[in-house]
Amino acid sequence: MELGHGAGTTTFTRAHLNDKEGQQDLDPWKAAYSSLDTSKFKNQGLSSPQPLPLGASAQGSSLGQCHLKEIPPPPPTAASRDSLGMDPQSRSLKNAGSRSSSRENRATSGEGAQPCQGTDDGPSLGAQDQRSTPTNQKGSIIPNNIRHKFGSNVVDQLVSEEQAQKAIDEVFEGQKRASSWPSRTQNPVEISSVFSDYYDLGYNMRSNLFRGAAEETKSLMKASYTPEVIEKSVRDLEHWHGRKTDDLGRWHQKNAMNLNLQKALEEKYGENSKSKSSKY
């Protein structure tokens, strides 16, 4: 039993080693198939158009389509199969050739994308032509800021070129007249001759402190407040409601004030006159 078990173990280990050697022999073939599969996926990724994002513009989509259409297909995958059985020197040569071919493909794709770019430049040129002012507005007298503010159609309907020219001519004529007027600065001799009468007056007259010569003034107090006013006065008793006094009552008040003022003045000036006479 022990020998058989030992023999069994030896056979098992030999079989296990044989399986490992077979797996090592199969590993390079698996690597080759995996490299072929990856190259296929890469080629498929290059040939299939990628979806554009939602926010991309129409111009970007057109450029992307042009690039995708004009990119030539990559070289066949047979080269990758042959590369497995070649030396490292031959592999380096193949890689250099593939790099040069990829550069040529990029150059051809860039040249093919130029007509697509030309199509995008078309609308921009048209927009510039539209933004440019028309020929009839280039030689117009009306400035562009007024046309922009009120609208070119409204300005053309309401104002003509002749009216604008007339208004501008009137402004220029007014400026010429203002410049042709004599300067207001005059010689001091002329000023003295013009204002000689004014300077002949005194300071009080020139300052307008009083207006003219003095005149005799007479008080109308005694002439207005006479007994005739009391005789001619009539009180309307029917329309006396809510009144405290009337014209007659006002007259009596003023008359009493006048009498009191006269008495006070007589007392004051009478005492002063008596004192002066006593001194002398």
From Swiss-Prot:
Where in the cell?
Cytoplasmic vesicle, Secretory vesicle, Acrosome; Cell projection, Cilium, Flagellum
Superkingdom is Eukaryota
- Give the GO cellular component terms, alphabetically: acrosomal vesicle; sperm flagellum
Q: Which UniProt keywords apply?
A: Cell projection, Cilium, Cytoplasmic vesicle, Flagellum
Predominant localisation class: cytoplasm
Q: Where is this region: Disordered?
A: 1-147
One Pfam family this sequence matches: TEX33
Which residue stretches does the UniProt record annotate as biased composition, category Polar residues? Answer: 35-49, 89-100, 127-143
Does the entry feature the keyword Secreted, yes or no? Answer: no
Q: Which PANTHER family match?
A: TESTIS-EXPRESSED PROTEIN 33 (PTHR31702:SF2)
Question: What's its job?
Answer: Seems to be associated with spermiogenesis but is not essential for sperm development and male fertility.
Q: What is this protein called?
A: Ciliary microtubule inner protein 4
Q: List the source organism.
A: Homo sapiens
Question: Which gene carries the instructions for this protein?
Answer: CIMIP4
